[in-house]
Each structure stands twice: as structure tokens, then as C-alpha cells.
Amino acid sequence: NNSLEKTFKSSLNIKDADDSIKRTYKIAISVTGEYAAYHGGTFALVNAAIAKTLTNINAVFENDFNVSLQLVSTNDAVIYLDAGTDPYGDTSNNYNNELQATLDTEILEANYDIGHLLSAVGSVDGNAGCIGCVCVNGLKGSGYTSDNTPDGFNFDIDLVAHEIGHQFGANHTWTHNGNEGENVQMEPGSGSTIMGYAGITGSTNVQANSDPYFHAISIEQITTYSKSISCASTTNTGNTTPTVNAGSNLTLPIGTPFKLVGTGGDIDGDILTYCWEQADENDASTTFPSTNSTSGVSFRSFNPSTDNKRYFPRLSTI
């Protein structure tokens, strides 16, 4: 075969935050005594840490799919300052069930839409408890994130935003370890967006940490799920969906570098950014691209920018 044909999925066909509705969900964030101790052991210091994490997450969620997370007013009821008396075990083995029971008892089921636990037990540990369970009683409060240094931008984005992404219906986008069967694994190796595993897959790492945005396929999953549930408070933003054209499909000889140029417009006058992403799902036989790959993912995602063109590969590598 002396040609390579790639058909890029038009962004016009991907479900996104296109209905001009901002969705605000009530989130309950509990913390273990270990997390509280790491952050100084007082309500004021712990609340400041939670606020910083929530600010970083909301910056991404509001930009990518017009979703905002608002801390419940009674959240202090699930902040525990003493590891010896908190309702959580010494390991994360039963965090999912312990958190769900704690939130339903202390916050009450009707008073929150999504719940998450922050802990400082172990290293790089997290589990959403479910895929797509916001607003679902009995499951919505079962996600947790734990790390022995539970602080900083990478903790917030690589770990907490990743697990909350699962709670909102997103699956993994990495391809480093086979196929999960959801047809959304579209990033080489570890991946570099939030639903990947950047920095923790060894030889297939694309980079050390996740970039602060979701892959288009994750945006599609989360947007679809958000539109299917009804517990959010909604606000009509009046924003108009931008127009975009990624250009015609191309058929190229194997190994040929190429350039893609897109065009976009926005009648509201908003500044547009562009992000080119390959939409070929992993087929379980590929984990990392090579010059001999005949299927799977060849190109990684890069941070959105105002530049409407991209070279494949990057000019600096040719």
C-alpha cells in the first residue's frame, strides 16, 4: 500500500457545549485527616486548599464544556482535621463506599450533585467509583483522589480533574495498555490531555504531566452526559456557537509531511483557539506510534492556540 488516507472527524459532528447553557453543579468535597494535616490542620487552611483546587478545575470545565462546580454551603461538615477520628480507613481500599455513606449522612443526598474525597494516603491514587454518575443517587458521591503531596496545579489537573472527568462520563484516552472498548482511546501512549495518563506509563510517556484541557472526544462524552441529566442549575449565556471548517480530507503518500489549515468565525467577536487532534481509535494492537504503524494513533494533541494551522510532524523535527 503506497498511500495513507486519514479521514478527520469534523468538529461539526462532535457533540459539544453548543446550547448556550451554563450548567452549575453542587459539589461536596470531603477531606481526610491526613489531607488536612498536610495543609496545616485548620478549617481555614483546608478550605483555602479546596478553593484553589476548585478554581483550577473550574477554569478548565467552564472553558471546555460550560460546566461549573459550586461547593455546597455545608461542606465544613465533611472536612475532617484528625486522621484518628475521620470516617475513612488508613488505606484507600474502601474510600468509594466510605465517602458515599459520609456524604449521604452529613450533607444529605438531596443537597449535592457530585461528591469527591481528597486524601494524602499513598501516591498517585484515584478512583471515580463509576463512569457517568453525577446526579445518580447512591453513586454520585463515590469519587476520590489521593497523593502524598496533595497540592499544586498538577495534583489538581492530572489527578482530581481526571477523576471528576470520569464522574462526568469520560473514559480514558490513552493507548499505552490495550483497548478499553469505549472507542475513545485516541492519544498515543500515555496521552497528554486530562483523561490520559501523562507521566505514569514509563516508556510510552508523551510528557511528564497532563495539559489543562480535555481531548475533543472527552468533551463529546462529558457534554453528552451533562445534557442527559437534569440536576444542574442552568443559565442561558447568550453565546453563539463559533463556525469552523477543518478543510477537505487528504490522501497522501506514506511518510509525507503535511500541513492542515482551519478557518473559524465567531459573530460575538470572541477570540478563537484551534486544536488539531487525530480521531483514530486504538485497535488494541498498537500502544505507541512508530514509523511502521499501519493503524492506531500517530499524532498527539497540543495545547490550543490562536494559530489556525499545524504541521505534521512539527517543523522543528523535520
State where each predicted segment sits.
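Fold-level signature of zinc-dependent metallopeptidase catalytic domains
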Residues: N1-G132
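Proline/serine/threonine-rich low-complexity linkers at boundaries of modular beta-sandwich domains
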Residues: I222-T243
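Extracellular acidic loop/turn motifs
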Residues: C231, D266-T273, E281-A284
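Short, solvent-exposed loop/linker segments at the N-terminal edge
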Residues: A246, L250-F258
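Extracellular acidic, Ser/Thr/Pro-rich low-complexity tracts
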Residues: L252, T263-D268
